[in-house]
Amino acid sequence: MKFVFASFALFVIFLCFSQSLSQSYFRCRDNEVFDNCISNCGPPRCSNILNTYPCTNLGPLCTPGCKCKDGRVYDNQGRCVLQTECFQK
């Protein structure tokens, strides 16, 4: 029983440690947040938010990294802006 408990405790510690390492590896910019699973189809951008075609990327389903906060997309300069700002030019 002690072995099972010790194994479980080590597993939990490993999960916590690996999560903190992956978050510290990425330095997210203004209006970005870290996410463990970002779609490999690419982030939403001003240039593709109206695209109605589904992504057909056959690679891994997701990767860790930074993404725009809710309601924001990347503009042409790579900054996270509100979606409404995409159409103001």
UniProtKB/Swiss-Prot annotation:
Its main location: secreted. It comes from Olivierus martensii (Manchurian scorpion). Serine protease inhibitor. Belongs to the serine protease inhibitor-like (TIL domain-containing) family. GO terms for cellular component: extracellular region. This is Venom peptide BmKAPI. It comes from the Eukaryota. Keywords: Disulfide bond, Protease inhibitor, Secreted, Serine protease inhibitor, Signal. InterPro entries: Ser_inhib-like_sf (IPR036084), TIL_dom (IPR002919). Residues 28-86 form the TIL domain.
